[in-house]
């Protein structure tokens, strides 16, 4: 058994069946003591690493063997951790507990944060022109320069967005124009392939029957229009087309 070898083969009243339990005392056998040291040292270093990773703790471990050999581990810096320890001890004058040290640290941090909040609030009030009565001419010039630089950046960003929107609308206009041309070409081709469609009210000749566009001084009124066919004999026809003339006239 390994534990027997560590104890030099001596039986112990603390030894149990299965995994044994040894008495914690100095191992007299040099070889067994060195083997035990290596095993326990590795386990201690592993535990220190796990503690630093799992608990986000600052850990520093220093071990000297019986032969004077140094073994150390630190997740940050052994020297830095020692300096922090010395500072904590000196600040507390060797009388404070860990809880008191932590409380003092958090009080200092909260005081710094409160000071930063007050400084930011004062700066915002100055930018809004609320607390400029007690400012010197130099401070006012500095504040004016800050505001001008801020306005310049804001206008630059605004113009950038406007130009981007204009560019998008222009591209959109070109796309719509191209789509319109394609649709017109398809309609014309469809009418050429199907001449009967042009005779329908929805055909291209239907546009020729519509009156010319009106100016603003002469609004459109459907009662001012009538068909020429109403003024001509019912039997009048074109000899070539064989249909009535439907040219629209406007009463003035």
Swiss-Prot record:
Entry keyword Transcription: yes
MF (Gene Ontology): DNA-binding transcription factor activity, RNA polymerase II-specific; protein dimerization activity; RNA polymerase II cis-regulatory region sequence-specific DNA binding
SMART domains linked: MADS
Coiled-coil region(s): 99-166
GO cellular component: a single term: nucleus
Single biological process term from Gene Ontology: regulation of transcription by RNA polymerase II
Pfam families for the chain: K-box (PF01486), SRF-TF (PF00319)
Role according to the record: Probable transcription factor involved in the control of organ identity during the early development of flowers. Is required for normal development of stamens and carpels in the wild-type flower. Plays a role in maintaining the determinacy of the floral meristem. Acts as C class cadastral protein by repressing the A class floral homeotic genes like APETALA1. Forms a heterodimer via the K-box domain with either SEPALATTA1/AGL2, SEPALATTA2/AGL4, SEPALLATA3/AGL9 or AGL6 that could be involved in genes regulation during floral meristem development.
Entries under PANTHER family matching the protein: SERUM RESPONSE FACTOR HOMOLOG
Assembly with partners or alone: Homodimer, capable of binding to CArG-box sequences. Forms a heterodimer via the K-box domain with either SEPALATTA1/AGL2, SEPALATTA2/AGL4, SEPALLATA3/AGL9 or AGL6. Heterodimerization also seen with some other Agamous-like MADS-box proteins. Interacts with AGL15 and AGL16. Component of a complex made of FLOR1, VSP1 and AGAMOUS (AG). Binds directly with FLR1.
UniProt name for this protein: Floral homeotic protein AGAMOUS
Organism: Arabidopsis thaliana (Mouse-ear cress)
Lineage, opening ranks: Eukaryota, Viridiplantae, Streptophyta, Embryophyta, Tracheophyta
């Amino acid at each position: 058994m390994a534990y027997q070898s560590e104890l030099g083969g001596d039986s112990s009243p603390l030894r149990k069946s299965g995994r044994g339990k040894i008495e914690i005392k100095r191992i007299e056998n040099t070889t067994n003591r060195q083997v035990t040291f290596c095993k326990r040292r590795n386990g201690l270093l592993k535990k220190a690493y796990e503690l630093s990773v799992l608990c986000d703790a600052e850990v520093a471990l220093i071990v000297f063997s019986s032969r004077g050999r140094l073994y150390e581990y630190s997740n940050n810096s052994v020297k830095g951790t020692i300096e922090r320890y010395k500072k904590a001890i000196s600040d507390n004058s060797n009388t404070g507990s860990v809880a008191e040290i932590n409380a003092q640290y958090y009080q200092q941090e909260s005081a710094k944060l409160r000071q930063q909040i007050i400084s930011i609030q004062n700066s915002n009030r100055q930018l809004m022109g609320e607390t400029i009565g007690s400012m010197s001419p130099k401070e006012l010039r500095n504040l004016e320069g800050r505001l001008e630089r801020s306005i310049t950046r804001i206008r630059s960003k605004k113009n950038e967005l406007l130009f981007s929107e204009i560019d998008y609308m222009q591209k959109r206009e070109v796309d719509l124009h191209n789509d319109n041309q394609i649709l017109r070409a398809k309609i014309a081709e469809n009418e050429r392939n199907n001449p009967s469609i042009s005779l329908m009210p929805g055909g291209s000749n239907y546009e020729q029957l519509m009156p010319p566009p009106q100016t603003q001084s002469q609004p459109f009124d459907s009662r001012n229009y009538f068909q020429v066919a109403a003024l001509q004999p019912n039997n009048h026809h074109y000899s070539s087309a064989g249909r009535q003339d439907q040219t629209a006239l406007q009463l003035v």
